[in-house]
Amino acid sequence: WLGKTQHLSVKEQLNLGVRYFDLRVNHVKNDYVIYHSIINGTRFDPILDDIASFIEENPSETLLLDFQHFKNGSDEYVYHTVLEKLKDHLVVQNNDQSELAFVDELRLKDTRGKCIVFFGDDSPFVKEAHIFSRNNDTCTQKGQALDSCYISSYHAMKSKQFIDEALGYYMDKIQTKKEEEGHKGIFVWQCQLTDSKLVFGPYHRERSHEANMNVFIENLPQQDYFSDINVIMRDFL
């Protein structure tokens, strides 16, 4: 329970409308599993099978697969398995734009029935035409196609302080990027609280945050920055 961040399987989340997944893969013995912090979870291959089946059966949908972290050299396996299982359902860059500009200018008509796959730029496979780069946790790198800022001290705050301080800081970061680099790319707004002391676990932290965060999200369409948001990340649907 200390590492668990969702009660529902990926298949169940897909059926409920989730279209972005933060996936972290660890190589353990002769298998590959999803992990969070020091805790290993379910096997990776069945998850990718569910994703492949969903996108095959729902050709109007678009999925974002954000491989935030790899462990024990798992990126090579993930790369080849994604290529094998998703095949014709991958967004591929076919021009000489920067990948930031390419992703930023994509429209839904370009991505229906496809997955956009992101790796950290420390993986050699990020150079491939169907793998796009994600920024580091502090979002200090230039030209990355996806930003998902995470500063651990913010996520250890109490709910109202987090909303007042952290979310504004993350939004300022992406708007500054858009102004300075001319493109925004995909912006994932990490809105979950975490249990930095490993006492109560993620579920307790999210329940203490849920009411405040739900009100905040309900009011987002009235904000002038609303169009800059691509993904709102939460734990425990």
Language model features with spans:
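Catalytic cores of phosphodiester-bond hydrolases, prominently lipid phosphodiesterases
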Residues: 1-237
